[in-house]
Design a protein with these regions (language model features):
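Sec-dependent signal peptide recognition
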Residues: 1-3
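Amphipathic hydrophobic-ligand
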Residues: 124-129, 210-215, 386-390, 431-433, ...
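Acidic/polar loop patches that form or flank catalytic/metal-binding clefts of enzymes
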Residues: 213, 341-344, 405-406, 492-494, ...
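Gram-negative/organellar outer-membrane beta-barrel architecture
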Residues: 169-172, 305, 314, 319-556, ...
Length: 695
């Protein structure tokens, strides 16, 4: 029956039920591109032109305009089952039939005009697009299209003038010209022209012009004044631009409306340093914190002052409205994480705009006080260990009324051996608890008004973990740390841990572990009871977000130091640095210096091809009170983000290759790490990409 059905469908014509005068579109022949431009703007232009001209036919392969499956099942069903109005045949039609893609639906004339407009948007004013229709010689009701794109030479910007603005507005625009997105010699590009309108609007709004918008700016272009493919540009205000657009406004009274838990309107208020706070029954946020988040004078940058120098000499620039400050305040309220929503309103003192003052009103509602999260996972390891894990986290938001959050996390995992031999049955487990208190600011040391200029957090953390390795040992680890994270620039992130203390306790070692210890003393030293008092600093650089950065860089470096301050205290009391086995609370403490770095570079060859390279390395040097680095601080390689052909801890160090056993991974750590990856990434078709890599 199945074979008979296929034969029946194959016998159906795909053009049997086409409307009168219609032609079935069967795809495109490869596009012809003449005088292709190799500039980056030209690549973007061609990508958009290709997207505008692309139309997938029936039975297309992955949405391709040129490649199709050999069997048009959807069309066969459309033509074979169109006659059914009910029953099983109608169900088949509704589920599997494909409506024919008609040439009139593709409408190549409209697509041709759209493609020409796209070429002009990117400076190819003399570019052209044409197409040909190829009728199928076997069926005159089927046809393909082939487009020809002739890009020709692009036009370039000659000069850009500002005309038709007030003297003050023109002066502001001239002061900001050095940051212009369009300049002499660059290729004409509508995207950059739109970006320039937004930039100038932002510049004006940063010096008080609250009502200015990018839509109030337009361009006039002249290609006749300067020959040989150059455009003279004039940026002018649109006809009918309201006068209030160029008027500077200052900020007046500031007020906050904090809604109740159920959305109740405020029923009480208070004043704090000129900030009026309206609340329901009881203030949910400390007044001093609201003042810090909304302090209009705190969000200030030097560049803004330089750009506006000499513009308004009779009044303080700090009282002017600034889009930059508004954005920073909104980002600050969002980053605190305690508000369900927060809306800023700027209200003029009078509707006729006689007054130049805007009052600021913030309406906010707090989020839920508690969050809970439950995670499950199942792990399968190459040493025949399998088992489930779970973690449960409860977070209390806005603990002290200043955006702080406190969380408690419980985690556990259980593993058993999956080998066939019951005599080797081995069960391991791990249990842990941790608690963290996170402040959305730098708590100590205070960093002055710069604290308002960038995101910053302070984290206090305590934890305890019990790990059981059946037949070998139990390891108890507990400790805590204080970490400061802040990002002064979009490309730079700093993390400072001035205090990190870990205490490892080796418990219940078995005879099997004693045997292993005799064979590998370094392993025992790395696992024995010891304190790890450490300090750590991490710097991360990432310029992927920088506009126009074609080949981004990501670089992270971490420096950690352990035991040096403790050893210095002992030195004060007479014990030399070189003395070994000094104890802290009855246990030796680790002393080492650790450096770890990771550098990544992405080279974009063109829009479809790129090369990604990575080199990473690290070294840990033990000295003073330590012979061997703690096991938790040693390096290992392998896994999805490392040497991808090997699982974690299953390769090295160096050429070392231990005997195969379920515990061989314990040895495969080292004091020095150097690894590199290079990967060629390419586009196969549309959103389908491939890569070839070497680790």
């Amino acid at each position: 029956l199945y074979i008979a059905g296929l034969i029946f469908l194959a016998g159906c014509s795909t053009t049997k039920h086409l409307p009168e005068g219609e032609i079935l579109y069967t795809g495109q022949k490869p596009m012809i591109v003449l005088n292709r431009s190799e500039t980056s703007v030209g690549e973007i232009a061609m990508e958009e032109v290709e997207a505008a001209l692309a139309t997938a036919p029936n039975n297309s392969l992955l949405g391709s305009s040129t490649i199709r499956y050999p069997f048009p099942f959807g069309l066969w069903i459309y033509n074979g089952f169109q006659k059914y109005e009910k029953g099983f045949g109608k169900w088949i039609f509704n589920k599997f039939a494909a409506t024919p893609v008609l040439m009139s639906t593709v409408n190549p004339d409209i697509r041709q005009k759209a493609a020409v407009n796209l070429l002009r948007d990117y400076g190819y004013f003399n570019g052209s697009v044409s197409y040909k229709t190829f009728i199928d010689p076997k069926d005159s009701l089927k046809a393909k299209l082939q487009y020809t794109v002739n890009m020709r030479n692009p036009y370039f910007i000659d000069t850009v003038y500002y005309r038709g603005f007030s003297e003050r507005t023109t002066r502001i625009m001239e002061l900001g010209r050095r940051r212009s997105l369009i300049s002499s010699g660059e290729q004409f590009n509508v995207a950059d022209l739109d970006g320039e309108r937004t930039r100038i609007s932002t510049l004006l709004r940063n010096v008080g012009c609250y009502y200015f918008r990018p839509d109030y700016l337009t361009y006039q272009a002249d290609t006749m004044i300067v020959p040989n493919g150059h455009v003279q540009m004039r940026l002018i205000p649109v006809p009918g631009m309201p006068k209030v657009a160029e008027k500077q406004f200052r900020v007046g009274r500031k007020s906050v409306y904090l809604l109740g838990k159920q959305g109740q309107e405020p029923n009480d208020s208070m004043d704090y340093k000129g900030l009026t706070i309206h609340y329901y029954n009881k203030p949910p946020v400390r007044p001093n914190m609201l003042y810090r988040w909304l302090n209009y004078q705190g969000y200030r940058r030097k560049r803004q002052i330089q750009d506006s120098a000499g513009i308004a000499r009779q009044r303080s620039m700090q009282s002017l409205y600034s889009l930059y400050r508004q954005t920073r305040i909104q980002e600050r309220l969002a980053s605190v994480g305690i508000f369900r929503y927060a809306e800023m309103q700027y209200i003029p003192r009078d509707t006729a705009f006689v007054s130049d003052t805007l009052d600021v009103r913030v309406i906010a509602a707090l989020d839920k006080p508690y969050d809970a999260e439950l995670d499950f996972n199942v792990t399968m390891k190459s040493n025949n260990q399998t088992g489930p894990g779970a973690a449960f986290t409860v977070t209390k938001n806005n603990v002290f009324g200043g955006g702080e959050s406190w969380n408690v996390k419980l985690n556990g995992s259980y593993e058993w051996q999956t080998g066939k031999s019951s005599s080797s049955l081995m069960n391991s487990y791990e249990l842990g608890i941790s608690t963290s208190l996170i402040f959305p600011r730098v708590v100590f040391p205070r960093m002055g008004d710069r604290e308002y200029d960038f995101p910053a957090t302070t984290t206090f953390r305590l934890y305890a973990d019990q790990m059981n390795r059946a037949k070998y040992y139990k390891l108890l680890a507990f400790g805590g740390n204080v970490t400061y994270d802040f990002q002064p620039k979009s490309t730079s992130r700093h993390s400072i841990t001035p205090f990190r203390l870990t205490f490892n306790v080796l418990r219940n070692p078995t005879a099997a572990f004693d045997t292993l210890r005799a064979e590998n003393p370094a392993l025992y030293v790395s696992l024995r009871d010891q304190f790890i008092p450490a300090m750590e600093y991490t710097y991360t650089y990432d310029n992927a977000s920088v506009r126009g950065k074609r080949n981004p860089i990501w670089w992270q470096t971490t420096v950690a130091s352990a035991g040096n301050l403790t050893s210095a205290v002992y030195r004060i009391f007479g014990k030399p640095f070189s003395e070994k086995e000094k104890n802290l609370l009855g246990a030796p403490f680790a002393q080492f210096l650790k450096l770890n770095t990771d550098y990544r570079y992405l080279w974009k060859i063109d829009r479809n091809n790129s090369v990604a390279a990575r080199i990473a390395g690290g070294v840990i040097w033990t000295y003073g009170n330590s012979h061997v680095a703690p096991y938790s601080e040693q390096f290992y390689v392998g896994g999805a983000n490392s040497i991808r052909a090997f699982t974690v801890r299953s390769i090295g160090p160096g050429g070392y290759h231990p005997e195969k056993s379920e515990f061989s991974y314990l040895d495969q750590t080292g004091d020095i790490r150097l690894e590199a990856n290079i990967e060629y990434r390419f586009r196969i078709y549309k959103d389908l990409h491939g890569a070839v890599f070497l680790d």
